[in-house]
């Protein structure tokens, strides 16, 4: 059986702040509001990605999001993180923006807004 060292999943699990979304906001605008209110989510996803990519070639941001939800449910007394699945594609792009060297390791697909243009 493999054990996980405690430092491997040490994350900043500050409680989420639910921003106020105005009627008619686009998905991108809602993501930007969520990210502005919760920058620690991107930092935690970045930490998880770095840990994974130190041992593997590819990582799925959906898996990182699920891991973050799980860790927040295990490591805190509050509710597990509730992150809109639609935001994960934006987080993938944000991680690549922060770490261009990860571009070949994180799969992205065109966004609906890109296909509509």
Across the structure, where does each feature detected by a protein language model lie?
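Generic ordered-secondary-structure signal
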Residues: 1, 36, 40, 55-59, ...
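Intrinsically disordered, low-complexity serine/threonine- and proline-rich regulatory segments
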Residues: 2-42
């Amino acid at each position: 059986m493999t054990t996980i060292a405690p430092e491997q999943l040490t994350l900043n699990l500050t409680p989420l702040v639910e921003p106020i979304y105005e009627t008619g906001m686009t998905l991108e605008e809602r993501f930007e509001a969520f990210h502005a209110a919760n920058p620690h989510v991107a930092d935690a996803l970045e930490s998880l990605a770095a840990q994974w990519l130190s041992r593997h070639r590819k990582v799925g941001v959906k898996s990182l999001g699920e891991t973050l939800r799980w860790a927040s449910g295990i490591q805190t007394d509050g509710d597990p993180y509730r992150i809109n699945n639609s935001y994960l594609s934006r987080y993938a792009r944000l991680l690549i923006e922060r770490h261009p060297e990860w571009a070949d390791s994180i799969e992205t697909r065109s966004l609906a807004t890109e296909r509509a243009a």
